[in-house]
Structure formats: structure tokens, C-alpha cells
């Protein structure tokens, strides 16, 4: 197999498993950065940017992740995190109210879940957009446009979130690695969309 690259000196993993190992290391770094919660959008956006670099022969390492994160952290990232956290708390409060036995609780819970799913798709697709590194408003605007125009991609985003949540539920330590494969899935959906619609 002449097209297969051989392992270089000092390389821990072979060429077939290198990206997988890199995704897991970036996932672990992302989990650590997400711990304050308000840093979650910036952490996921940075992971997507690092993984996007794999297609351009740039290294996908935790070191590059932290270097890029140091360059881009700004007040807008914390505001985006605060908005995301407020949305999660509002959704949790809505579900608690629906579970309290109020009239029409079933319809209310279903409506709240649908709105939350749409908001999550737009937010996650915004994290995968290159614009999220510098301008969250532009990233959200483009992500909302993509979410409506690319329904298949939005379905893939929901499937990736469900898979990450299921893995974390089945085995708790996987929760610390789940952001890596999730970021890879988000990046793949965005790259797929970019290839389909040249910008």
C-alpha cells in the first residue's frame, strides 16, 4: 500500500489512528475549558477551528487548541456563553413548570423542546462557523441561514448531540471525551455545507 504514510520517529500513533487520538485530546481539552460553563461556546468554537485545520495539514493537538484559545478569548465569548447558559436555565425552568401538572403541560413541553432543539442546532452550527472566532453575531446569522437551508445537516447535528449525550449517559468518563467527536461532527457538517454552496 504505497499511499499509506508510515509512522514517523516520535509519533505515538500510526497514521490510521492519529486523527482519532487527536480528536480525543482536543475533546479532553475542550471539556476542561468548558468547566466554567460560560466558556463553553468559545471552547467548542476553538475545537472546531482546530479540527478544521486537519484538512489544511495543520496540526490537530491540544497545544494548538490552547494557543488558539489564548489568541481569541474576548468579552464577546463570555457574553455568548452567558446567553447560552441563560437559555439552558430557561429551558430547564420551562420543563420544571411543565412537570408541575399545569393545564396544557404536554403541549407546552413539546413546544419548548422543539424551540430548544432549533436553538441548539443554530448555536452548535454557529460554533462550527469560522466567523465564530471573531464575530458571534455573524456566525449565528449564517448558522441560522444554514440550519434552514440545510435540513439534512441540521438533522446530523441533532444526531451528533444525541450520540454524545448517550455515550456520556452510558459511561460517565466518556462525557469528558465527547466534545471532541461532537466538534468533529459539527465541523464536518459545516465543511459539507461549504462545499455544497461556495461562499
Where are the regions a protein language model picked out?
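Helix-coil boundary and N-terminal low-complexity module in membrane systems
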Residues: 1-110, 119-199
Amino acid at each position: 500500500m504505497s499511499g499509506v504514510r508510515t509512522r514517523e520517529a516520535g509519533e505515538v500513533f500510526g497514521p490510521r489512528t492519529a486523527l482519532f487520538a487527536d480528536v480525543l485530546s482536543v475533546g479532553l481539552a475542550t471539556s476542561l475549558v468548558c468547566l466554567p460553563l460560560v466558556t463553553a461556546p468559545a471552547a467548542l468554537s476553538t475545537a472546531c477551528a482546530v479540527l478544521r485545520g486537519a484538512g489544511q495539514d495543520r496540526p490537530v493537538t491540544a497545544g494548538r487548541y490552547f494557543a488558539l484559545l489564548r489568541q481569541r478569548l474576548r468579552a464577546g465569548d463570555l457574553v455568548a456563553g452567558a446567553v447560552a447558559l441563560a437559555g439552558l436555565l430557561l429551558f430547564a425552568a420551562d420543563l420544571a413548570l411543565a412537570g408541575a401538572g399545569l393545564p396544557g403541560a404536554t403541549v407546552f413541553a413539546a413546544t419548548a423542546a422543539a424551540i430548544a432543539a432549533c436553538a441548539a442546532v443554530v448555536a452548535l452550527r454557529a460554533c462550527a462557523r469560522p466567523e465564530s472566532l471573531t464575530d458571534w453575531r455573524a456566525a449565528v446569522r449564517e448558522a441560522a441561514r444554514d440550519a434552514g437551508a440545510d435540513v439534512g445537516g441540521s438533522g446530523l447535528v441533532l444526531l451528533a448531540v444525541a450520540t454524545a449525550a448517550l455515550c456520556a449517559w452510558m459511561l460517565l468518563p466518556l462525557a469528558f471525551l465527547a466534545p471532541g467527536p461532537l466538534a468533529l461532527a459539527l465541523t464536518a457538517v459545516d465543511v459539507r455545507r461549504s462545499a455544497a454552496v461556495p461562499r
